[in-house]
Structure formats: C-alpha cells, structure tokens
Design a protein with these regions (language model features):
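Short, low-complexity N-terminal intrinsically disordered segments enriched in polar/charged residues
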Residues: 1-49, 156
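Short beta-strand edge/turn micro-motifs at domain boundaries
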Residues: 2-3, 122-150
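Non-catalytic cap/lid and distal C-terminal segments of serine-dependent acyl enzymes
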Residues: 14, 74, 121-124, 151-153
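Short, hydrophobic secondary-structure boundary micro-motifs
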Residues: 39-40, 54-56, 139
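Hydrophobic residues on conserved beta-strands that form the core of alpha/beta folds
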Residues: 48, 91-93, 138
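Surface-exposed, charged secondary-structure patches
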Residues: 52-53, 57-115
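A short, polar/proline- and glycine-enriched secondary-structure boundary/capping micro-motif
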Residues: 64-66, 116-119, 148-155
Length: 156
C-alpha cells in the first residue's frame, strides 16, 4: 500500500505518462546525463508502487549477479556510479505487444559514456506497462546487455 506522501512524491510530468512512447522516452531521459545526480523523483514517478527492476547478466556494479529490486533499491545500488560516471542511453529499436491496458515492450538500447561517442554497450529491456488512472505506469523492467555469447537477435 502506498501512503499519500509516497503518491505526492511520485507525481509525474503529465507528458511523461501520456502514452507508452512517452513513458519509455522519459525513462531513457531520466537515466542519461553527465556524471552527477539524476532526477530520481522523475524516474520514481514513472513506476507503479511495488514495481520491480531486474538487471541480469553483466552489471556495472555486480557482474553476473541477478537481483530483483524495488525502484528505490535499484537507485541506492546505482546512484554512486552515476554520480562519478557520465552515462547516456537511448532506444534504438522497439517491439511491443498490447492487449487491453497492458503492453509488453522489448526495447533495444545502446549506452555510452559519451553522448556523441561510439556505443559502449547494447542490450534489451523487457518492460511491462499498465494503463490505469488515466496514465501509463511501468510495472516491471528486466534487462540484459549484449555479449559475444548473447548477441541481440535480428528481430530486436
């Protein structure tokens, strides 16, 4: 259950949650930037209370570890890295399937420490979205980076 204080802290920008395209764009914008603090309140506002983030495979902070984390746990885990390192991530391809108010999205991304530089990492985010209360929410996100043993399939 979410308290009124939690709900107020999660108040989104209307344009960030108006459509599936908008919420996915907002996630990538909230994560990208030069070394320093991110707008964590903006990021939190995109997620349904109780949402889970599941980084798998090679991770910046803990290679090979798989954790199921709340949004706040993930922010606690990664914020020191973002404060010390520039990180730019953008979507390069998307596959989405919708049924009613739910959407399963496979979002292929590339990430780099330089917004104009060579790509450093590519991967896929599996995102589940839900339309409730006149807005879109992110319910869960699981992602993995591409490796030689785990290349991104052609359809993605």
């Amino acid at each position: 259950m979410t308290s009124m204080t939690d709900q107020a802290a999660r108040k989104p920008r209307a344009e960030d949650v108006a459509s599936p395209d908008a919420i996915i764009k907002a996630v990538y914008e909230a994560l990208s930037g030069p070394a320093g603090k991110r707008n964590w309140q903006r990021l939190r506002s995109l997620y349904l209370p109780g949402a889970r983030l599941i980084p798998i495979g090679n991770r910046v902070q803990a290679e090979g570890r798989t954790d199921v984390m709340s949004v706040d746990e993930w922010i606690d885990d990664i914020s020191a890295y973002f404060e010390e390192h520039p990180f730019y991530i953008r979507e390069i391809q998307r596959h989405a399937d919708r049924f009613g108010d739910m959407i399963q999205v496979f979002s292929t991304y590339e990430a780099s420490s330089d917004p104009e530089g060579e790509k450093k990492t590519r991967g896929i985010r599996a995102m589940q979205l839900l339309h409730r209360d006149d807005r879109w929410w992110i319910v869960n996100v699981m992602w993995d980076n591409e490796t030689r043993k785990n290349p991104i399939p052609g359809e993605f």
